[in-house]
Amino acid sequence: MRLTRRSLLLGSLLLAAAPVAADPPPFNLAQWEADIRAFEEADRAHPPQPGGVLFAGSSSIRLWATLADDFPGIRVLNRGFGGSQIREVTAFVPRIVLPYKPSLIVFYCGTNDIASGSRTAAQAADDFQSFVRSVRTSLPETRIAFISAAPNPARWHLRAEMQELNRRVRDWSRTADRIDFIDVWPAMLGPGGEPKAGIYREDNLHMNAAGYAIWKQVVGDYLRDLKK
């Protein structure tokens, strides 16, 4: 019995002394470094004026090529990077949000989080709140608007989770300070309650010009209401 105890003690000491492997990060920020540096180079070449409207998020923001033309008279800045999740956008807040001191952030992200299986709707909604806290630490007066998860054929099987994300963010926005919810979901559905035909690219995931025309209308209505 004495030998067994000594063996157990020695084994415990060896385990305690052994190096412990760190948990792998939940995502690879290095994959976005080229995108972020491209933004920074553009900023050095043409420094944006503070107080504008920053559009941030994933590929649906990045691919909005007509953004400036869609909202004439508004100083808009596009800092979307494709495939990103909310936690990744949050990690880059010091580099692609805070330097611009925006008066308003229009944010679209969260669908990749759910589609990848890495986050539930509840977790993605919590991640958005973390994004807000990250911004508000330095920019307490900045208003932030969340564009709802959009329906599309490629991820229609995930619609319940997407709608749950929308519900959670909408509910929070009703009581949170200067947090708004822009609901594009209904406008993107056809008469049968499924995603409209003809507003998506061949991948049935990303929008074409007709899809962005819907966003232009819905987001434009929101921006006009802010001026009232």
Task: Locate each region found by the language model.
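Charged helix-capping and loop-helix junction motifs
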Residues: 121-129, 161-166
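Generic structural signal for well-ordered alpha-helices
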Residues: 93, 128-133, 166, 170
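Oxyanion-hole/transition-state-stabilizing segment in secreted/luminal serine hydrolases
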Residues: 61-77, 86-125, 149-153
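Catalytic His-Asp segment of secreted/periplasmic serine-dependent ester chemistry enzymes
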Residues: 150-228
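Cell-envelope and extracellular/periplasmic
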Residues: 80-82, 104-119, 129, 133, ...
